[in-house]
Amino acid sequence: MFIGEYQHSLDSKNRMIVPAKLREDLGEMFVITKGLDGCIYAYTINEWRILENKLKTLPLTNKDARAFVRFFFSGACIVDLDKQGRGLIPQNLKEYAGIEKDIVSIGVLSRVEIWSREKWINYNESDIDYDLIAEKMNDLGI
């Protein structure tokens, strides 16, 4: 399970130093892809396989299902960390997430989200009504 918030930067070669705590759970090789809300999702190889198997069951006849699978898989790539715990974020994902240098990685249960620091600050300053969200979660039995 991934938890916590970590602030760090890309180096001159677009490599992210994965924080030690996240590296322990992500492993030396993991998958990153376009996430929702303008961030990048990172999954362990095992968690990616589970997700992949779930998405395989979506009906090809459903337009929204096809669109989501295309969105999710077209940006996916495997990150292989070097001995210093650095991994390359490809240009297309950097552009998608608006990442220039400063990033924030957050643990969100089964995945890590990688945000540009600016987008993360803006997200946290937005008018999110957490009390209303909590009520909706209660309606779902959570």
Curated annotation (Swiss-Prot):
GO terms for molecular function: DNA-binding transcription factor activity; transcription cis-regulatory region binding. GO terms for cellular component: cytoplasm; nucleoid. PROSITE patterns: SPOVT_ABRB (PS51740). Keywords: Cytoplasm, DNA-binding, Repeat, Transcription, Transcription regulation. The keyword Mitochondrion does not apply. It holds the Pfam family MraZ. Residues 5-47, 76-119 form the SpoVT-AbrB domain. It is found in: Cytoplasm, Nucleoid. One of its GO terms (biological process) is negative regulation of DNA-templated transcription initiation. It comes from the Bacteria. Its main location: cytoplasm. Coiled coil: none annotated. NCBIfam families: division/cell wall cluster transcriptional repressor MraZ. Forms oligomers. Belongs to the MraZ family. This is Transcriptional regulator MraZ. The gene is mraZ.
